[in-house]
From Swiss-Prot:
Catalytic activity: L-methionyl-tRNA(fMet) + (6R)-10-formyltetrahydrofolate = N-formyl-L-methionyl-tRNA(fMet) + (6S)-5,6,7,8-tetrahydrofolate + H(+)
Coiled coil: none
Keywords carried by this UniProt record: Protein biosynthesis, Transferase
Signal sequence extent: none
The protein's name: Methionyl-tRNA formyltransferase
Function: Attaches a formyl group to the free amino group of methionyl-tRNA(fMet). The formyl group appears to play a dual role in the initiator identity of N-formylmethionyl-tRNA by promoting its recognition by IF2 and preventing the misappropriation of this tRNA by the elongation apparatus.
Organism: Actinobacillus pleuropneumoniae serotype 3 (strain JL03)
A GO MF label: methionyl-tRNA formyltransferase activity
GO cellular component term, pick one: cytosol
Family matches, as PROSITE patterns: GART
Alphabetized SUPFAM superfamilies for the sequence: FMT C-terminal domain-like, Formyltransferase
UniProt keyword annotation of Heme present: no
Amino acid sequence: MSKLNIIFAGTPDFAAQHLQALLDSEHNVIAVYTQPDKPAGRGKKLQASPVKQLAEQHNIPVYQPKSLRKEDAQAELKALNADVMVVVAYGLILPEAVLNAPKYGCLNVHGSLLPRWRGAAPIQRSIWAGDQETGVTIMQMDIGLDTGDMLHKVTTPIAADETSASLYAKLAELAPPALLEVLNGLESQAFKAEKQDEALSNYAEKLSKEEAKLDWNLTACQLERNIRAFNPWPISFLTLEVDGVEQSVKVYQANVLPHQAKAAGTVLQADKNGIQIATQEGVLNITQLQPSGKKPMSVQDFLNGRADWFAVGKQL
C-alpha cells in the first residue's frame, strides 16, 4: 500500500470524524473542501464547520466554494493533483469534471446499505421505515444521486430504542475503518465494484418540521418510529388546546400498546406510567415530553400542575 494524496470534502461532525481517521492514517490529506461559514447562534456570527475547524488545527488548506460548477473552481481542484477525493456529507453537488479530476475519482461514505436509501436522510429514514438493520456503503461516485458502484458495505442492527442520534454515533464508529480499508486497497483493486439494483432503491427524503407533527391517523407503531427517527431534529410534537390557547409539546419517548376502542386522537389515560392516546391502530403511550420553554421531562413531572392538559376523553 502506498501513501495516497487525498482531498477531503465534508461539513458536519459526522464528516469530521472521518477526516480525523484520515489524519491518523498513513495517507496524506492535501486539501479540505467544506461549505462556506454560516451564521449560527443568537448573535448570528459566522461559524466554521466542524470539518474546517479540524482542518485548520492541522494546517490543511481549506477551500469553501459556494458551488463547484464554475470552471475556475474546477481548475483549482484539478491542480491539486489528488489521487482520490473522499466525500462525506459535503452538501454540494459534484459535476462530472470534479468526479473525474482525481486519479481514482471520488469515493463517498453513505449512511445506508445502498441501494436501500439514497438521498439526504438515509439514517433517519431507516428508523422511520422500521428497517431491522442498516450500515454504511463506500461507493465510487458518479453523476447520479447515490447511484455509483458499491465497493464495500458494513452492517449494524437497528435497536428497538434506536434514535437517529444514537444511530449516527454508531455509523460514525463503523464508517471510518471501512473507508480506510477501501483506500488501502485502492491501488490493488482489492474491492470489486458492484452495480446497484435500481429496483431496490428508495429516496430518503429530507425531514421537515411539518412531518414531525404527530398525526393520530397514523398507526401507533409508525408514530413511535417517527419519534425516534426525528430525534435529535426536528423532534416530534403534538398540539392541544389549553384554556383556549394552542400549546405545542415536544415528544421524546413513547411506546406502543395494542388495545384501542376509541377514535384516533382520544386521550385514554394519563398517569405516571404515560399518556395514552388512541391512534388509527393501537395506542401511543408517551413517557417523556417537553412543554414550550422547559426542559424535557418525565410524564410524571409533566402532569404535576398540568393534569388537565391530557384529561381522559379529550380529543387532540
